[in-house]
Amino acid sequence: PTEPAEAKAQEAPGAAEDDTVPAEPTTAACAPAVGTAMPLEKVADPVFSSGALGNGVGILPSEGRIVAPVAGTVVTAMDSGHAYGIKTDDGVEVLIHVGLDTVNLKGEGFSPRVSAGQRVDRGDPLVDVDLAAVREAGYDPTIILVVTNTASLTAVVPVVDGEVTTSTTVIEIDH
């Protein structure tokens, strides 16, 4: 009678593993806007272009709708609407920073669509930006997309190919 119990005990860990669905691995980040992608080094901001905040890309937007490049939880949504942090279910952390020094606009020209704590899917709107107003105020509207926890991942590789849409992979991620 002890044999079936032992067999069950041996099967239980395997059965438990089968019941647990691991988080779908995040293998890519898409462009957060339609526009032209560029290497991070070409972004006119020394902190971002140095890679100090992680590997990523710059995107000069041609449209003002900025969307989530990955699915996850919005962990940061600045009141000014210019920056968003998203953490995926498997721990990839991305920062979407809209424009250079645009925090100085204090939200003018930015219409946020999400708030901290909200779940988003890839492609969900984060903010609508009046690109003309940003330019008229003298600011560079380049969007910076970086993986802020690059150091804890196996590889974070920017894939830059000029014109992009919100379904274009701009960063490949390997755990």
Regions found by a protein language model. Name each.
Residues 1-4:
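Pore-lining transmembrane helices
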Residues 6-175:
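Contiguous, well-folded functional domains in the mature portion of proteins
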